[in-house]
């Protein structure tokens, strides 16, 4: 199970990234983190950019709402998602938590 921390209008969870993979994909829960594979190399921030773009498509939220809070130069990262402060944001948080719980 992937631990999700909820702060004021923010969800954070651990992410394990495997760069230079043959395709972008979710591997699943691994070592208390969501493990993903991405095709970009870990050079000049390209892996982080692709990681954010992949999570944006996976979670259905804008790239601007996703930040790498910790581990920008590491395979193990802490990703935070900024959500709107209204009821729609709470529904979005519940949807994302349910999606992550499925891994």
Curated annotation (Swiss-Prot):
Belongs to the UPF0235 family. InterPro entries: DUF167 (IPR003746), YggU-like_sf (IPR036591). Coiled coil: none annotated. PANTHER family: UPF0235 PROTEIN C15ORF40. Transmembrane segments: none annotated. It holds the Pfam family DUF167. Gene3D superfamilies: YggU-like. GO terms for cellular component: cytoplasm. It comes from the Bacteria. This is UPF0235 protein Dole_0289. The lineage of its organism: Bacteria, Pseudomonadati, Thermodesulfobacteriota, Desulfobacteria, Desulfobacterales.
